């Protein structure tokens, strides 16, 4: 008996010997590709470029599997792959079949090639009943080839109507049988139409103009179906006999007629491909080329015979048609309708002068027919109870007109109410009162009133009045009164003239030297609209071009940005001024620029304050507050402290320092700071102040959670224990007080500035073991 000695090693000599026993023939020698008598190879199909899996169904798990391949037309059996379960090997020559791999005992071929078409033999080594057996499985693999994209070929892409045309659907490759279908799409047609089945050739005999358009063919086999690009068949034909149309359309016994001074359009159309070339004649004289001839203003001299000649230049053929045009002269244009506004009544006017005879006109309204007259007619109509959107029509009739001609007037109530606004003009010397109430028909009438006294004349849809600017206009109220026939009296709007009022964001701003300062003010009210501006400490107007200053207008707000604050140039009182034609108002903002001095005496005249160090910085109230404690050292006078914060630890990406507290008394040594975001890590520093002189900033620290206190636990144990436990606990606290660094602390070490003269010493940690025994 022959067996495998190991399942987790590469193929060894014993396995190779077994396969030599399995292999009926040597590699490269002829070997019968069919099974024994009565057996047939299993048929398997695969698609080129896809994957196929050849299964070797052998029953029990085999000890080894060998796959071989015999191409069609060959008797040479070629090894493909071998596996023992624990290891496998694929022959390099298997690349001709595709990307070959083994999945258990199955042979998987990806990116299948046509060279894989042929017979496959699966030989397996089995152990059954203590004996080694071999099994064989024959498979026949058929590789199917998808059809390639077809292409339509026309023997004549531009035939003349009446000849024979053949279209061929050419396919480069594809497994037969192939199925063909033809589709036709006319340029102005609704869509594709099936015109042929099964044949690769489509014959159009004889071809006519209905065959013009795009032709596509579809080819399919068992694998796929593809459609060709369209091929255009351009059928040459025509021209047919031209058809002449006249607009506006009017028929007479001898042809067409049109009204004098109307625009008359004569159009000619003759079916032809390529399109016809058109030439117009009047009484045998050429007057125009092109399919359309337009008489911009017809007169009686345009009466005559008009001929359209259509010419196909490709075939050099032509046809023609002649019609007669007669010009009549009714009244010019059409009736003209107008409406005049009066209180409670509308006066409707309709006129249509000229023509022979005069046109007959009559009005018709929502409640019936109105008056009639010749040439012009007037109708005064009471608007009481008249709905919005009422339509009045004036009908004009003339013997030369087949249909009456209308003009219409629709009465519309203007929406809403009048709208008032005011602007200043000519250097604030005048104030312009403006009032508007659009959208009405007839237009609304508007007028300005001052204490019920009319100002100026009535205006239609809009009223404007100029006032000379003067201070006594402040507080005065002006009314714009509107009226319309369809609305109830009393529609108005009012304006109150006011001197501007403003407010500042902060009346006092303090920044350190070299930092940015922001001063803000907002306009609260003012009519006419006011202009905001900033004045510097020397009462000079600050503009966008002023060095060191940037203005940020935001609607009714104007913010002033002071860059690189300098106490010598930027300290002082700034004014935000609001100005309109009635006057102005202002608010002051004091900007303090605090100096950081490097020596004992600052250039500003105040001695340098002492240095400050942060001794404790802990969180409070779920990290929404911090408790800050500090100490001072070194000589110097002080008048207070300044605390700064920023939303990150010090780094190149850290934000600018912001003032967290500045009104701290000189005797204070702690401060609680609130308004923090629990999700943000803050950094803090503190400076001592001597009037406007700032000392060195302290080291930068970030807050930590408060350390755990052992007092409650110890006292509880002492209360329930013996005196010995109490004495031992007191010894623990005494030792901790003398050696604070021997106990762990949750506060992280802070970074001290390199300029800080004081460096903290850190003792080496001491391990202490304390045992407390309490007896209840």
From Swiss-Prot:
Name recorded for this polypeptide: V-set and immunoglobulin domain-containing protein 10-like 2
Domain (Ig-like): residue spans on this chain: 32-140, 150-234, 242-324, 399-498, 500-592
Cell location: Membrane
GO-annotated cellular components: membrane
Glycosylation sites: 611, 637
Keyword Cytoplasm on entry: no
Chief location of this protein within or outside the cell: membrane
Residue ranges occupied by any Fibronectin type-III domain in the UniProt entry: 608-708
Membrane association type: Single-pass membrane protein
Cross-referenced InterPro entries: FN3_dom (IPR003961), FN3_sf (IPR036116), Ig-like_dom (IPR007110), Ig-like_dom_sf (IPR036179), Ig-like_fold (IPR013783), Ig_sub (IPR003599), Ig_sub2 (IPR003598), IgSF_CEA-related (IPR052598)
Record's signal peptide: 1-28
Keyword tags: Disulfide bond, Glycoprotein, Immunoglobulin domain, Membrane, Repeat, Signal, Transmembrane, Transmembrane helix
Transmembrane segments: 713-733
Organism: Mus musculus
Cystine pairs: 56-122, 169-217, 268-308, 435-480, 521-576
Superkingdom: Eukaryota
Gene3D superfamilies per the UniProt record, alphabetical: Immunoglobulins
